[in-house]
Amino acid sequence: MDNHANEINKLSRELGLLSNYEFNMDELKNLSPLDSTSSSIYIGDNLTYLQGLSKTSPKTIDFCYIDPPYNTGNKIIYHDNRKSVSSDIFGLHNEWMSFLLPRLFHAHKMLKDTGIIAISIDDYEFAHLKILMDKIFGEDNFIGNIVVCRSKNGKGSKRNIASAHEYLLVYGKSDMAELSGQPDDKSLYDKVDCFGEYRIDGMFRKKGDSSLRTDRPNMFYPLYFNPSTGEVQVEPELGLKTVYPIDSKGIERRWLWSKETARERSWELFASKNGVVYVKNYSSSHKRIKVRTLWNDSSFYTERATNEITKIFGSKVFDTPKALNYIMSIINCMAKPDALILDFFAGSGTTAHAAAVLNSLDGGSRKTILMESNHPITKTHIAYKSGFRKISDITISRLNYVSDNFPDFKYKKIEII
């Protein structure tokens, strides 16, 4: 048996799952290594492609985003009912976990050591996804869990709870993985001087550990400030007030910088009328901050996503789309402008669309590798009535839409099965 299959089956047994995985190379004899020079869509069973590409193209992916089935049991365009009848440790969730395990395993193999994966999920399978990810990627490589508001009023009435959020679970391939950070919020910069827009970020007097005068004696010195303008300088001058880094309890502390640094960067300091010295934080178009774990933006809401789908396709051909701005924000925070991005539950193709928009905005060269099923669409679904016969037809239609609107966007289609 193939080594990958052995590893997956070992993981499955350790988790207490009932599945047994087999690797069939016959289906992949015509599969070429990953072409990272263009965007691509692989049509068919994503597991087949993942297991092949993890062999031919390991460590090629910079970032992976997926929006897998949530196992809701709802009748939507794709199969979303993998509730088991077994009575093992995971009960109803066994089949869903067994479905995702090999796919996540191969995605892990495809990621670079610096790679990152982000997965959308809701309450029903969050805990079980976390177990899978901890096992495959390692608990130490858990980066964070982002709570994403998906609607204003929420949905459902179970026990008088209206769920208005879902999650974005983020892991790195190794300790070398690092988020790009989210763009700073320019609206927070409420002051301006000749050097640009700025905000007051924190006191210039050191707090906490190693903040005493005795810790760094050379960082205890007087500053001189103008109470009318807030300007601060190191040299004394007639009419200026003097301030030392002494706190409200009379404890002698120290400044953040040496006297020489404060002299060179005095333009970055600001004093209040009562002599509290602060550091100015200037705005920059390239500035990044740590990714926050709560995202509440109306442009991320499901309603916005549905409106976008309706505008592009003429009707709601996909039941569970993600908003374009939401996927753009994920990619922008977690991947570099030249990233190769994998989405093996491509759905309505939003990931490719988001990457194309970002490239047009910042001159990036992001490429997307998509995978989507060629499963037939039921005749009663609105997508069938709109002319689509397979789920992948919707994805390809979105890619054509992107190509029509972004001339630099090109893609190729791979279907070997």
Swiss-Prot record:
InterPro entries with a match to the protein in the record: DNA_methylase_N4/N6 (IPR002941), DNA_methylase_N6_adenine_CS (IPR002052), N4/N6-MTase_EcoPI_Mod-like (IPR002295), SAM-dependent_MTases_sf (IPR029063)
Entry-linked Pfam families: N6_N4_Mtase
Gene Ontology MF terms in the entry: DNA binding; N-methyltransferase activity; site-specific DNA-methyltransferase (adenine-specific) activity
Source species, domain of life: Bacteria
An individual GO BP term: DNA restriction-modification system
Gene3D superfamilies: Vaccinia Virus protein VP39 (3.40.50.150)
Methyltransferase recorded as keyword: yes
EC number: 2.1.1.72
Keywords assigned by UniProt, alphabetized: Methyltransferase, Restriction system, S-adenosyl-L-methionine, Transferase
Reactions mediated catalytically: a 2'-deoxyadenosine in DNA + S-adenosyl-L-methionine = an N(6)-methyl-2'-deoxyadenosine in DNA + S-adenosyl-L-homocysteine + H(+)
Recorded family membership: Belongs to the N(4)/N(6)-methyltransferase family.
Protein name (record): Type II methyltransferase M.KpnI
Native species: Klebsiella pneumoniae
Organism taxonomic ancestry: Bacteria, Pseudomonadati, Pseudomonadota, Gammaproteobacteria, Enterobacterales
Gene giving rise to this polypeptide: kpnIM
